[in-house]
Amino acid sequence: MPKYYCDYCDTYLTHDSPSVRKTHCTGRKHKDNVKFYYQKWMEEQAQHLIDATTAAYKAGKIAPNPFTAGPPKPNISIPPPTMNMPPRPGMIPGMPAGAPPLLMGPNGPLPPPMMGMRPPPMMVPTMGMPPMGLGMRPPVMSAAPPQLNPKS
């Protein structure tokens, strides 16, 4: 009668019956051995990836990290913004470059408030609350409501 060999535990089981294998595979030592086996396998894979990356870098197949190059050279400068450039999102054409973008409404940016008027309140519904204007819906009743003063 052939015996069952467990690769994780490096041992032979007494019988090759499904019940013996099931009992063995649900045991604490077997589960620990399986966990250790895969931890070791993952460490080997990670080390292999590190070695392959290092070898490729040394062979010149991987460019050095561009973020470790340091600050840009002083003779290269970014041109200042001009009025000929298109406006940023949320900006009205012709606004100065340092001005903050306008508040966004459902149909685009809100117009600036008129002199002497307060800005509109920012009403944002909270989680689980219906949007403004909908309010609470009355419950749906399948029967007529009970009468409070029945006539006797």
Swiss-Prot record:
A zinc finger (Matrin-type) spans 4-36. It comes from the Eukaryota. GO terms for cellular component: commitment complex; U1 snRNP; U2-type prespliceosome. This is U1 small nuclear ribonucleoprotein C. Keywords: Metal-binding, Nucleus, Ribonucleoprotein, RNA-binding, Zinc, Zinc-finger. It holds the Pfam family zf-U1. Component of the spliceosomal U1 snRNP, which is essential for recognition of the pre-mRNA 5' splice-site and the subsequent assembly of the spliceosome. U1-C is directly involved in initial 5' splice-site recognition for both constitutive and regulated alternative splicing. The interaction with the 5' splice-site seems to precede base-pairing between the pre-mRNA and the U1 snRNA. Stimulates commitment or early (E) complex formation by stabilizing the base pairing of the 5' end of the U1 snRNA and the 5' splice-site region. U1 snRNP is composed of the 7 core Sm proteins B/B', D1, D2, D3, E, F and G that assemble in a heptameric protein ring on the Sm site of the small nuclear RNA to form the core snRNP, and at least 3 U1 snRNP-specific proteins U1-70K, U1-A and U1-C. U1-C interacts with U1 snRNA and the 5' splice-site region of the pre-mRNA. Belongs to the U1 small nuclear ribonucleoprotein C family. Its main location: nucleus. SUPFAM superfamilies: beta-beta-alpha zinc fingers. GO terms for biological process: mRNA 5'-splice site recognition; spliceosomal snRNP assembly. PANTHER family: U1 SMALL NUCLEAR RIBONUCLEOPROTEIN C. It comes from Anopheles gambiae. It is found in: Nucleus. SMART domains: ZnF_U1 (SM00451). GO terms for molecular function: mRNA binding; pre-mRNA 5'-splice site binding; U1 snRNA binding; zinc ion binding. The lineage of its organism: Eukaryota, Metazoa, Ecdysozoa, Arthropoda, Hexapoda.
